[in-house]
Structure formats: structure tokens, C-alpha cells
């Protein structure tokens, strides 16, 4: 889990737009965040396997 201070800092509106960055809405992780879902790759995988994300399924070819 991310530090609460860093999560709060990321939620504040930055002075300049380029200073803003994405964090996972579930765990607060700052890297590998999918904007469409607002989740990091780890949380996205866990929720997809649990069937909590509608329309997402494991690919097979």
C-alpha cells in the first residue's frame, strides 16, 4: 500500500497540469496504471480473474 501522504498529494490539483500523475484507485500504486480502469496492472489482473470487471476476459489464441 502506498503512503497516505503521497496518495493525498496525488489527489490534489497540481499547480501545472504536467505535474499531475495517475495512481491506482485501489492500492495507490503510481506505476503501470491503466487510465481506462484507473487500476494498476496487479489490481487489474486480480479483479479480472475474480470476474469483477465486466467485459474483461482472459485472451486465448
Curated annotation (Swiss-Prot):
Q: Which organism is it from?
A: Mycolicibacterium vanbaalenii (strain DSM 7251 / JCM 13017 / BCRC 16820 / KCTC 9966 / NRRL B-24157 / PYR-1) (Mycobacterium vanbaalenii)
Q: What's the superkingdom here?
A: Bacteria
Gene Ontology BP term (one): translation
Q: Subunit structure of this entry?
A: Part of the 30S ribosomal subunit. Contacts proteins S3 and S10.
Q: What is this protein called?
A: Small ribosomal subunit protein uS14B
Task: List, alphabetically, the InterPro entries matched.
Answer: Ribosomal_uS14, Ribosomal_uS14_bact, Ribosomal_uS14_CS, Ribosomal_uS14_sf
Keyword Glycosyltransferase recorded: no
Source gene?
rpsZ
Q: Which amino acid positions bind Zn(2+), per UniProt?
A: 24, 27, 40, 43
Which molecular function terms from Gene Ontology are attached? rRNA binding; structural constituent of ribosome; zinc ion binding
Amino acid at each position: 500500500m502506498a503512503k497516505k501522504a503521497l496518495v493525498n498529494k496525488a489527489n490534489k490539483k497540481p499547480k501545472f497540469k504536467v505535474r499531475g500523475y495517475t495512481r491506482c484507485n485501489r492500492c495507490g500504486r503510481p506505476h503501470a496504471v491503466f487510465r481506462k480502469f484507473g487500476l494498476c496492472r496487479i489490481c487489474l489482473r486480480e479483479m479480472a480473474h475474480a470476474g469483477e470487471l465486466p467485459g474483461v476476459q482472459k485472451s486465448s489464441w
